[in-house]
Swiss-Prot record:
Family that this chain belongs to: Belongs to the bacterial ribosomal protein bL33 family.
A molecular-function term among this protein's GO annotations: structural constituent of ribosome
Keyword Cell inner membrane part of the UniProt annotation: no
Domain of life: Bacteria
Name under which the protein is recorded: Large ribosomal subunit protein bL33B
Pfam entry (one): Ribosomal_L33
Natural source organism: Lactobacillus helveticus (strain DPC 4571)
The keyword Nucleus belongs to this UniProt entry's keyword annotation: no
Length: 49
């Protein structure tokens, strides 16, 4: 199984707060609600490549 490193970027301020290892077989980008320390609140984080 091939894995790749990806980052989760805040959709509000754009800062990359979290890093993940994800399967290359997934076609859609991951979107999660996570806490952004720069915004100080829960925001939507999207996977960057």
């Amino acid at each position: 199984m091939a894995v790749k490193k990806a980052a989760l970027a805040c959709s509000v301020c754009g800062s990359r707060n979290y890093s993940i290892t994800a399967s290359k077989n997934r076609t859609k980008r991951l979107e999660l609600k996570k806490f952004c320390k720069h915004c100080g609140k829960m925001t939507l984080h999207k996977e960057t490549r």
